[in-house]
Amino acid sequence: WDRLLYGVGELLVFGPLKNTLGMSRVRVAYTAGEAIGPELFDFYRSLGINLKQLYGQTEAAVFVTMQSDGEVRSETVGAAFPDVELKIAENGEVLYRSPGVFQEYYKNPQATAETKTPDGWVKTGDAGYVNEEGHLRIIDRAKEVGKMNDGSMFAPKFIENKLKFYQYIKEAVTFGDQKDYASAFINIDLDAVANWAERNNITYGGYQEIASHDKVRGLIEGCIMEVNENLAADSHLRSSQIQRFIILHKELDADDGELTRT
C-alpha cells in the first residue's frame, strides 16, 4: 500500500517537482560548503532525491567526512573518511589529520603555520563536534561561536537560522556568549503575521500595534518553544535554549546601522 501511494505521489507530485528543479535524472547528489538546514535537506530527501552531505577542504585532498548509504543524517556531515583522524579543540574548532593533507601553502610559511600544527593537525575554522555515532556535526564558523557561563557552546547564527525558518520571524538576534542564559530580539515578518492576524480576526493599526499584540507574542513564543525543544535534544547546545525574548516594535534597518547591506 505504501509503495502504491508513493507511486501515485511520484507520478503526480514528486516527479513533476523534480523535473522543475532539473533533478529528475539525478541518481545521487551531494551538498558541501556551508551546511544547509536539516529541514531543507529533509525536503529534498522526501522527494526521492538521494541527497547526502560531505565535508572537505582543498587542504585535505578534498574529503574529510562523507555520508554513506544507510548512514544519512540531516544534521551531520558523515563519519571520517578512512585514515582521517578528527579532533575537537578546546574552543570547539574541528581539526583533522591524514596522510593526504597538504604539505604547505606555496611560498607562504606564515599561513601554513596558522593553519597546520607541527604534528600535522589542520585547523578548519569551523566549530562542531563528533556525536555518539561517530558522525561530525558542523555548527558554525569557529570565530562566530562563543561560550555560555557554564562552559557550553553558544552558536548565535545557528540558533538565529532556526528561528528564521519560521515564516512569522523575519530577523532574529540572539545573545548568550559569557551569559547565564540565552535571549533574543525578534523582528516579525509583517506580511506573514498580518495574514495570520486576518485569519484569526485580529485587528491592528500598524506594525508597532501588531508587534505588541499579546496573541502575536504567543505565536512567536510557540516558534521559540519548538526551537528550544530541538536544542534541548542536543547535549552540546541545550544550554542555549532561549529563556527571554523581546519582539521589536520596528523593523531592523540598514539605514539605521542595525543591519549590514548583505
What are the residue ranges of the model-derived segments?
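Ser/Thr-glycine-rich phosphate-binding loops at phosphate-binding pockets of nucleotides
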Residues: G56-A60, T124, M148-N149, T260-T262
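Gly/Ser/Thr-rich phosphate-binding loop
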Residues: W1-V72, E85, K170
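Adenylate-forming
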Residues: V101, H135-K164, V193-D214, D234, ...
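Short Gly/Ser/Thr- and Asp/Glu-enriched loop/turn motifs at secondary-structure junctions
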Residues: R141, D177-Y181, S239-Q243
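C-terminal boundary motif of the adenylate-forming
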Residues: A127, E132, Y166-A192, L231-D234
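Conserved C-terminal "lid"/linker of ANL adenylate-forming enzymes
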Residues: G146, E171-V173, E226-T262
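Conserved ATP-binding/catalytic segment of the ANL
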Residues: A80-M148, F165
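Alpha-helical "lid/cap" subdomains adjacent to substrate-binding clefts that gate access
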Residues: W1-V28, L190-L231, H249
